[in-house]
Amino acid sequence: MRKSTLVALLSLAILAAFAQSKTVEQIRADYNALKTEVARLPQMKETGIMYCLIVDDNPQGATYPGIGHFRSKTHFYYDVAGDEPPVLRLAVESYESGTQRTDTEAMYDERGRASFVFVSQRTVEGQPVVEQRLYMEGDSALDFTLNKIGVAEGLRAQSQRDVWMKANRLVKQFLSVMGGGDE
């Protein structure tokens, strides 16, 4: 009896892990398809199915006191259908300050919630310092990696929250620019 219970529990655990990784795999596939779609937009011109809003802070590269070189450029890729409000699908931000560069990419579901967030912090010379990936389903984190290595649940809370906050800030920025900031 105990052996069959143990086998059943082990089977359920394996099934749950497989289902979760399948969801992560689906998010990866969706992200790759979306990036392919975005890459094709310039060739599609007015027949493209997405729009792109670009916010470029300090494009002339002026220096900030105490910081030095600073620039932030964000591309928001979104859909519009009829009279419905725009739906953000992907935000891509490059932020340079002093000798550091942070690139953030966030993919959103149809309800405006982040489903995948990638954050890469590098030095100006291009040397990677930290890469973080967060996979979400609704409000639940499915997986979080640091430099392509899974991070144990108990150790990832603050880093995972920081990555999620970047994606949340980007969607709020988009809604603010598009006139939907109170949602």
Predicted regions and their residues:
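Positively charged n-region of N-terminal signal peptides that target proteins for export
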Residues: 1-4
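Bacterial N-terminal signal peptides
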Residues: 7-16
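Long terminal segments
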Residues: 20-73, 125-183
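Amphipathic N-proximal alpha-helical interface segments
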Residues: 71-93
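Aromatic-rich beta-strand edge motifs centered on tyrosine
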Residues: 76-82, 105-110, 131-138
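A short glycine-rich beta-turn/N-cap micro-motif
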Residues: 84-89, 111-114, 137-143
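Mid-length scaffold segments of soluble, non-membrane domains
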Residues: 88-116
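Beta-turn initiation residues at beta-strand->coil junctions
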Residues: 92-96, 118-122, 145-147
